[in-house]
Design a protein with these regions (language model features):
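Alpha-helix C-terminal capping segments
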Residues: 97-103, 117-129, 229-234, 325-335
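Phosphate-binding loop/pocket of nucleotide- and phosphate-handling active sites
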Residues: 261-268, 322-354
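Small/polar-residue-rich loop-to-helix segments that shape phosphate-bearing ligand pockets
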Residues: 131-210, 268-284
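A glycine-rich, Thr/Ser-enriched phosphate-binding loop motif common to dinucleotide/cofactor-binding enzymes
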Residues: 80-96, 184-200, 317-322
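Active-site/ligand-binding loops adjacent to catalytic centers
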Residues: 163-178, 233-318
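N-terminal juxtadomain amphipathic helix
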Residues: 1-65
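Positively charged, low-complexity intrinsically disordered leader regions
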Residues: 43-105
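A short, small-residue-rich loop immediately preceding and capping a beta-strand
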Residues: 95, 103-122, 126-135, 211-223, ...
């Protein structure tokens, strides 16, 4: 593996490999925030295009692709099978490897739960300190597990306060901020996002038929962008269409003509893992480049699907089960045609109270 440079998802400007907690420096200066992504030299094999090609740190990855007998035309990628119970372990494994290799002593993140738990676990495994800036409504099980893992937890009422702490820590030479400090947000650290490419590679290897659609819960598009990049880099495959699911129109509003850097009012209800009032350029690009869509699934609808799935023994959190509601609608409206196979990404289990 040879990581060549970082490139902006918006303006395509190139930068040497370094840490940019505000995203693309050029776009940041111009007041139009956008994230960066990793680019490798042409001699690197597609499935080695990762910043750190190492054995799994805690056993993350290789999660099952489930065929449910009652779910016609789709499989479920069960990311709840990761060590701390969510897809965020893939991000944490990669970004903590980077922090350790770069000589940082602490990693810091603004998180609604899953990312903080993942980062705390992988930081502990690497002997690094971890600071998590969370909301005051963070469920007690998450608080307890963060304490068990040795994380420093700080709770705030607003995004601005959470980002303020991460911004302060990012100014310290011993700390790597892995969630961005720009407003509006651009997404998380690009080296961590590379870990999500493995989801695409695993799906391609596990699926018995061509996957034409992938349905993904989303907040700021880290997962969706990583999955898109993973499929796009695989030779001989047509990247599937990505359908990003949100609790109220954010990306959907952008696709209808609203500016990507806007503030979008709405109520996330109990969908804390995909909450937030902004979207990102990387989320928009993932949809546009794949020919996908944005799907709105309310908290009430997620509650209905949560109950249905629990009744069948499935233990995914509410934000995860939004993909089932979105898939049902995509099939009904013909966006996913008869005979086209889809993968629904179930991102986390329900045991954390999220």
């Amino acid at each position: 593996m040879t990581l060549s440079h970082l490139e902006c998802v918006r303006c395509a400007a190139r930068f040497p490999v370094a840490d940019h907690p505000r995203g693309c420096p050029d776009c940041d200066t111009a007041g139009r925030n956008a994230n960066l992504f990793c680019v490798y030299d042409d001699t690197t094999a597609p499935t080695e295009r990762l910043p750190y090609v190492t054995a799994p740190a805690l056993g993350e990855g290789d999660t099952p692709l489930l065929r449910l007998p009652w779910l016609e035309g789709a499989s479920v990628k069960n990311e709840a099978a990761n060590p701390t119970g969510s897809h965020k372990d893939r991000f944490a494994a990669m970004v903590v490897a980077h922090a350790a290799a770069s000589g940082y002593e602490r990693v810091a993140i603004s998180s609604s739960g899953n990312a903080g738990l993942a980062l705390a676990a992988y930081a502990a495994a690497a002997g690094l300190r971890c600071t998590v800036a969370g909301y005051t409504r963070l469920p007690e099980p998450v608080r307890e597990r963060l304490a068990d893992l040795g994380a420093d937890l700080h709770l705030f009422a607003t995004d601005a306060e959470r980002v303020g702490l991460i911004r302060e820590l990012a100014a310290r030479p011993d700390t790597l901020a892995v969630s961005n400090i720009a407003e509006p947000f651009v997404g998380c650290h690009p080296i961590g996002i590379e870990g999500y490419k493995r989801i695409a590679w695993e799906i391609a290897g596990q699926a018995a038929e061509e996957v034409r659609h992938v349905v993904v819960p989303t907040s700021r598009g880290d997962l969706a962008w990583g999955i898109h990049r993973g499929f796009a880099e695989l030779p001989g495959t047509t990247p599937p269409r990505l359908h990003l699911v949100e609790p109220f129109p954010r990306l959907a509003a952008v696709l209808a003509g609203a500016p990507v850097g806007g503030h979008f009012p709405g109520d996330s209800g109990r969908l804390s893992s995909i909450a937030g009032h902004t979207t990102t350029v990387q989320a928009h690009r993932a949809v546009m480049l794949s020919g996908g869509s944005a799907m709105v699934v309310s908290s009430d609808t997620a509650d209905e699907w949560y109950a249905r799935l629990c009744g069948r023994g499935h233990v995914w959190e509410r934000s995860s089960v939004t993909v089932f509601a979105a898939y049902e609608r995509l099939r009904a409206e013909g966006t996913i045609g008869a005979g086209e196979h889809a993968v629904l990404v179930a991102t986390s289990h329900f045991f954390k109270g999220l």
